[in-house]
Design a protein with these regions (language model features):
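Short amphipathic alpha-helix with an adjacent loop that forms part of the alpha/beta core around
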Residues: 2-10, 29
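Residues within well-ordered alpha-helical secondary structure of globular protein domains
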Residues: 8-9, 102, 158
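Donor/substrate-binding cores of folate-linked one-carbon enzymes
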Residues: 13-132
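Internal anion-binding site segments
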Residues: 127-188
């Protein structure tokens, strides 16, 4: 059996963070307390593999982490706990990732015993509030300068430093990691 190694460990619970893939039902069924995940958004917003990037690209002013039940459907399980944080103009993917990583670790430490004791009551996600944050494609790394300055600014921040937004200049690919919005500009 492909899950024999996990079965032999006899886990009470399986915890994942930033896994970004479907977990097979056979694995979800192993631990008696189920499987839980730390997801880097305030679910049901931004289900999927790139919630941090999309929270910045889409211009959110806040995001957070959600402790959630893992089920067969991606990021759709019951929510057990959440913590939020502000997104500022100084945030990039890297800075927000690091802050959410710390918040997620704290959320697990504060809630794991309660979860294992059955004292956390999960809240179903409102399917009418669901948005999706798919993985970033190569095409989405390319900047579109026909968009507003705010949209380009957010796009650069959301992809900085990995994978980095890019544009073509003199037939060369240029990576953009930082930008600044200039409110008014004149050549004269």
């Amino acid at each position: 059996d492909e899950y024999e190694f996990i079965k032999e460990l006899n886990p009470d619970v399986i915890i994942t963070c930033a896994y970004g893939q479907f977990v097979p039902q056979g694995l979800l069924d192993i631990p008696p307390h189920g499987c839980i995940n730390i997801h880097a958004s305030l679910l049901p917003k931004l289900r999927g593999g790139a919630p941090i990037q999309h929270s910045i690209i889409d211009g959110f002013d806040k995001t957070g982490v959600t402790l959630m039940e893992m089920i067969k459907k991606m990021d759709a399980g019951r929510m057990y706990a959440k913590v939020e944080t502000e997104i500022t103009d100084d945030d990039t993917y890297d800075s927000l990732h690091d802050r959410l990583k710390e918040l997620g670790a704290k959320l697990i430490l504060e809630n794991l015993d309660l979860y294992l004791e059955g004292k956390l009551i999960g809240e179903e996600q409102d399917e009418n509030e669901v948005t999706i944050s798919p993985n970033i494609s190569k095409e989405e790394e390319h900047l579109d300068f026909s968009k507003t300055s705010r949209e380009v600014f957010n796009h650069i921040r959301g992809l900085s430093s990995i994978p980095g937004a890019n544009f073509i200049y003199n037939n060369e690919v240029v990576k953009a990691y930082r930008s600044k919005i200039i409110e008014s500009f004149s050549l004269y």
